[in-house]
Regions:
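Amphipathic alpha-helical segments that line or abut small-molecule/effector binding pockets
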Residues: 20, 85-104, 109-113, 157, ...
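Amphipathic alpha-helical segments used for helix-helix packing
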Residues: 102-131, 172-177
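Short, charged helix-capping/linker segments at alpha-helix termini
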Residues: 32, 150-154
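A short secondary-structure junction motif
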Residues: 67-75, 105, 122, 140, ...
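Basic, helix-initiating cap at the start of DNA-binding domains
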Residues: 1-45, 52-53, 58-59, 85
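Amphipathic alpha-helical linker/stalk segments
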Residues: 62-94, 141
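Amphipathic C-terminal alpha-helical segment
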Residues: 100-104, 143, 160-182, 197-202
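Amphipathic alpha-helical packing segments from all-alpha helical-bundle domains
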Residues: 123-150, 189-192
Length: 202
């Protein structure tokens, strides 16, 4: 039977504190240079407590991705699952929401830069990002488009990838590479015409 102290170590409050401390450490020092002992200090727990909940640094980083996807709802696939009404209006509002949330959250942008920057040395981090964030979103968007027979899409998955890929490219230029002024494009113009390409296939 587990002791009360052990149960307290695994409490939701301590888990949240660990994740907050980990986010702070990863954002300040990147993945490779991040240290568990500094995370423990920031979280106000022992290293042993962290290892009881997260066996290694990779599992801790993956948990942060899951938190990013769920808690902040930056990439919320649930909205796609329960979408109703006009397809064009919904797609634009959905895309606008995603782009705005990314742009308005510096912490998320820094986290994305870490994933991209560390992907060469730690490909498992990039794969975890795709598994926890990109894949669910792509699958949900594919299902949504496939459920709209009036669109007469030849391939819903290709359409979903084109839609998501355009937004990812926009974020990369504007927010990650700091080059929105070099290749300017108004968000409304981009999304209005992107939606037209999707709902009016050639």
């Amino acid at each position: 039977m587990k002791s009360k102290s052990f149960e307290r170590d695994l409490s939701p409050e301590k888990t949240e504190a660990i994740l907050d401390g980990a986010m702070q450490e990863f954002l300040e020092n990147g993945y490779a240079a991040a240290r568990i002992d500094k995370i423990a200090v920031a979280a106000g727990v022992s290293k042993a407590t962290i290892y009881r909940r997260f066996p290694d640094k990779e599992s801790l980083f993956t948990a942060l991705m899951q938190q990013l996807a769920c808690k902040k709802e930056l990439f919320n696939s649930t909205q796609l699952q329960f979408a109703q009404g006009d397809v064009a209006s919904f797609l634009k509002s959905f895309a606008t929401m995603m782009l705005n949330r990314v742009a308005e959250d510096p912490q998320t942008l820094t986290f994305l830069r870490i994933v991209i920057g560390e992907s060469g040395r730690f490909p498992e981090l990039a794969r975890a990002f795709v598994q926890n964030i990109e894949k669910p979103m792509l699958e949900s968007l594919t299902q949504y488009l496939a459920s709209q027979p009036e669109l007469e899409l030849p391939d819903a998955e290709v359409a979903a990838r084109a839609f998501m890929g355009t937004m990812v490219h926009f974020v990369m230029l504007r927010d990650i590479l700091h080059s929105g002024d070099l290749v300017p494009m108004e968000c409304d113009r981009l999304l209005d015409n992107l939606v037209k390409l999707i709902i009016r296939p050639v």
